[in-house]
Design a protein with these regions (language model features):
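Short loop/turn hinge sites at secondary-structure boundaries
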Residues: 28-30, 41, 111
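Sensory/regulatory domains in signal-transduction proteins
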Residues: 43-159
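Short, low-complexity N-terminal regulatory "tails/caps" that precede and couple sensory modules
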Residues: 1-33
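Acidic, metal-coordinating catalytic segment for phosphate/diphosphate chemistry
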Residues: 35-45
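Short charge-dense sequence patches
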Residues: 24-31, 37, 51-59
Length: 159
Protein backbone atom coordinates (compact mmCIF):
# COMPACT_ATOMS: atom_id res chain seq x y z
CA UNK A 1 0.00 0.00 0.00
CA UNK A 2 1.60 3.26 -1.07
CA UNK A 3 1.97 6.10 1.35
CA UNK A 4 3.32 9.59 1.22
CA UNK A 5 6.82 9.83 2.56
CA UNK A 6 6.75 10.93 6.16
CA UNK A 7 10.31 12.22 6.33
CA UNK A 8 10.12 15.88 5.25
CA UNK A 9 9.15 17.35 8.63
CA UNK A 10 11.80 18.51 11.07
CA UNK A 11 10.52 16.25 13.86
CA UNK A 12 10.67 13.18 11.59
CA UNK A 13 14.18 14.13 10.52
CA UNK A 14 15.14 14.30 14.20
CA UNK A 15 13.51 10.93 14.86
CA UNK A 16 15.41 9.42 11.93
CA UNK A 17 18.63 10.82 13.39
CA UNK A 18 17.85 9.22 16.77
CA UNK A 19 17.04 5.89 15.09
CA UNK A 20 20.28 5.87 13.14
CA UNK A 21 22.56 7.16 15.90
CA UNK A 22 21.07 4.76 18.45
CA UNK A 23 21.51 1.85 16.02
CA UNK A 24 25.15 2.84 15.49
CA UNK A 25 25.63 3.02 19.27
CA UNK A 26 24.00 -0.37 19.86
CA UNK A 27 25.53 -2.38 17.02
CA UNK A 28 28.68 -0.42 16.09
CA UNK A 29 27.57 -0.22 12.48
CA UNK A 30 25.24 2.00 10.46
CA UNK A 31 21.67 0.89 9.81
CA UNK A 32 21.85 2.27 6.26
CA UNK A 33 24.89 3.17 4.18
CA UNK A 34 23.92 6.83 3.75
CA UNK A 35 23.93 7.41 7.53
CA UNK A 36 27.32 9.10 7.29
CA UNK A 37 28.50 12.51 8.44
CA UNK A 38 28.14 15.13 5.73
CA UNK A 39 24.97 13.75 4.16
CA UNK A 40 21.92 15.98 4.47
CA UNK A 41 19.28 15.07 7.05
CA UNK A 42 16.64 15.10 4.35
CA UNK A 43 18.58 12.68 2.13
CA UNK A 44 19.22 10.33 5.04
CA UNK A 45 15.50 10.41 5.92
CA UNK A 46 14.60 9.61 2.32
CA UNK A 47 16.98 6.64 2.31
CA UNK A 48 15.67 5.34 5.65
CA UNK A 49 12.07 5.64 4.49
CA UNK A 50 12.83 3.90 1.18
CA UNK A 51 15.29 1.23 2.35
CA UNK A 52 14.29 -2.29 1.38
CA UNK A 53 13.63 -3.69 4.86
CA UNK A 54 11.10 -2.76 7.56
CA UNK A 55 12.16 -0.29 10.25
CA UNK A 56 9.76 0.65 13.05
CA UNK A 57 10.02 2.60 16.29
CA UNK A 58 7.79 3.14 19.29
CA UNK A 59 7.92 5.51 22.23
CA UNK A 60 8.00 4.78 25.94
CA UNK A 61 5.25 3.99 28.43
CA UNK A 62 3.25 0.96 29.48
CA UNK A 63 1.55 0.66 26.06
CA UNK A 64 3.96 2.44 23.69
CA UNK A 65 2.68 3.97 20.47
CA UNK A 66 4.39 3.59 17.13
CA UNK A 67 6.37 6.70 16.21
CA UNK A 68 7.83 5.61 12.89
CA UNK A 69 7.47 3.01 10.17
CA UNK A 70 9.24 3.19 6.85
CA UNK A 71 7.75 2.30 3.47
CA UNK A 72 8.66 -1.39 3.77
CA UNK A 73 6.93 -1.58 7.17
CA UNK A 74 3.85 0.22 5.85
CA UNK A 75 3.59 -2.20 2.94
CA UNK A 76 4.15 -5.31 5.06
CA UNK A 77 1.53 -4.36 7.65
CA UNK A 78 -0.81 -3.03 4.94
CA UNK A 79 -1.22 0.37 6.55
CA UNK A 80 -0.89 4.03 5.64
CA UNK A 81 1.37 6.30 7.68
CA UNK A 82 -1.53 7.88 9.57
CA UNK A 83 -2.85 4.41 10.49
CA UNK A 84 0.48 3.03 11.72
CA UNK A 85 1.84 6.04 13.59
CA UNK A 86 0.00 6.40 16.88
CA UNK A 87 -1.10 2.76 16.95
CA UNK A 88 -0.12 0.75 20.06
CA UNK A 89 2.92 -1.25 18.98
CA UNK A 90 1.59 -4.41 20.66
CA UNK A 91 -1.00 -4.60 17.86
CA UNK A 92 1.73 -5.52 15.36
CA UNK A 93 1.76 -9.01 16.90
CA UNK A 94 -1.09 -11.49 17.35
CA UNK A 95 -2.50 -11.52 20.88
CA UNK A 96 -1.02 -14.92 21.73
CA UNK A 97 2.48 -13.69 20.74
CA UNK A 98 2.46 -10.43 22.70
CA UNK A 99 3.94 -11.84 25.91
CA UNK A 100 6.96 -13.23 24.03
CA UNK A 101 7.30 -9.95 22.14
CA UNK A 102 7.24 -8.00 25.41
CA UNK A 103 9.91 -10.28 26.88
CA UNK A 104 12.18 -9.49 23.93
CA UNK A 105 11.52 -5.75 24.25
CA UNK A 106 12.34 -5.88 27.97
CA UNK A 107 15.56 -7.77 27.26
CA UNK A 108 16.51 -5.24 24.60
CA UNK A 109 15.81 -2.41 27.04
CA UNK A 110 17.95 -4.03 29.73
CA UNK A 111 20.84 -4.82 27.39
CA UNK A 112 20.38 -1.70 25.20
CA UNK A 113 19.94 -3.96 22.16
CA UNK A 114 19.44 -7.53 21.02
CA UNK A 115 19.84 -9.31 17.72
CA UNK A 116 18.42 -12.61 16.52
CA UNK A 117 14.80 -12.08 17.65
CA UNK A 118 12.19 -14.19 15.85
CA UNK A 119 8.42 -14.06 16.18
CA UNK A 120 5.03 -13.90 14.53
CA UNK A 121 3.44 -10.66 13.39
CA UNK A 122 0.04 -9.86 11.90
CA UNK A 123 -0.89 -7.47 9.11
CA UNK A 124 -3.85 -5.10 9.15
CA UNK A 125 -5.79 -7.64 7.08
CA UNK A 126 -5.12 -10.43 9.60
CA UNK A 127 -2.45 -12.19 7.59
CA UNK A 128 0.32 -13.64 9.75
CA UNK A 129 3.99 -13.56 8.92
CA UNK A 130 7.16 -14.74 10.57
CA UNK A 131 10.14 -12.51 11.22
CA UNK A 132 13.60 -13.88 11.88
CA UNK A 133 16.88 -12.40 13.03
CA UNK A 134 15.39 -9.02 13.95
CA UNK A 135 17.45 -6.37 15.71
CA UNK A 136 15.82 -4.40 18.53
CA UNK A 137 17.56 -1.40 20.05
CA UNK A 138 16.96 1.40 22.53
CA UNK A 139 16.52 4.96 21.29
CA UNK A 140 18.53 7.56 23.21
CA UNK A 141 17.93 11.31 23.10
CA UNK A 142 20.53 14.10 23.37
CA UNK A 143 20.37 13.91 27.18
CA UNK A 144 21.18 10.18 27.05
CA UNK A 145 17.67 9.30 28.21
CA UNK A 146 15.69 6.42 26.76
CA UNK A 147 12.96 7.75 24.47
CA UNK A 148 11.79 4.51 22.83
CA UNK A 149 12.84 1.42 20.97
CA UNK A 150 13.29 0.51 17.33
CA UNK A 151 13.42 -2.71 15.35
CA UNK A 152 14.39 -3.84 11.89
CA UNK A 153 14.50 -7.13 10.04
CA UNK A 154 15.02 -8.31 6.51
CA UNK A 155 14.12 -11.97 6.89
CA UNK A 156 10.36 -12.59 6.88
CA UNK A 157 7.77 -14.80 5.19
CA UNK A 158 4.00 -15.27 5.19
CA UNK A 159 2.78 -18.01 7.55
Amino acid sequence: MASEAAWPTTDKQELARLLLESHQRAFSRPLIASAQPGHSKRLICQHLFACGFPVLAHGTGSDPLILYGNSAALQLWGLRWEQLVGMPSRLTAPEEERSERQTALTEAQTKEAIRGYSGTRISQGGRRFQIRDARIWTLWNEDNLCCGQAACFSDWWWS
